[in-house]
Amino acid sequence: MRQKVLITGANKGIGFETAKQLGDKGWTILLGARNEERGRAAVKTLENKGITAEWIQIDLNNIDTIHAAADYIATQHSDLKALINNAGISGNMNASPLDVELDELRELAEVNFFGNFEMIKTFTPILAKNHGRILNLTIPLNPNSFFHPFSYIATKSPLNSMIKLFGRHFKKNKIPVEIFGVMPGGITTDLNNHQKGFLMRSVNEGAQSIVKVLTDNHNHNGKILLRLMPFKIFK
């Protein structure tokens, strides 16, 4: 039987490449995207490669789309095996802390933190029926000279704590779901205006890291994995 995965923000970038690589391994792809035209176009591209895929409308800024997607998947794809929380927004990556507007910070938090929280909470009951996995794309906690976008780090890094807390809750209450985070490294995408450099990796390389962890059959519950060489695990 084909295993099924839901990937948010999967119409482009590392999300789409992850969908393609998992599809090549025989997974059925539920492609989460806000925009119907772009989502269906991405599905068509996958189908042309022989991959079974379906567009699912998910906008992390709109809780109703999350709940509607969960209701649909619970009835039509109740054997969902994995959720990849990939979607996120970066805001102005060059703005200093004193230049960031509160409205922008709230907008990013709505997607990067609250939206991902609602995805985890809403889809856990479906995944628990299938001993499923929740993989969250995340970033390093500490800014450095190479990577220090204030709004993005401030709204994305709390996800790491949330992963650990959900993992602890799942283990304590014997909920058969694994939740973990993956930091695939610096990936050249439109999120960073296609930044390049010796520390940056292609979407193909980044997706390989994600696929490897998702399918490795090791228990990563509550852990954050950083793509160095090999993966480093933060407990």
Would you name each region that the model predicts?
Residues 1-30:
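Canonical Rossmann dinucleotide-binding motif of NAD(H)/NADP(H)-dependent dehydrogenases/reductases
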Residues 25-41:
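Conserved glycine-rich Rossmann-like NAD(P)H-binding loop of the short-chain dehydrogenase/reductase
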Residues 36, 57-69:
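The beta1-alpha1 cofactor-binding region of Rossmann-like NAD(H)/NADP(H)-dependent oxidoreductases
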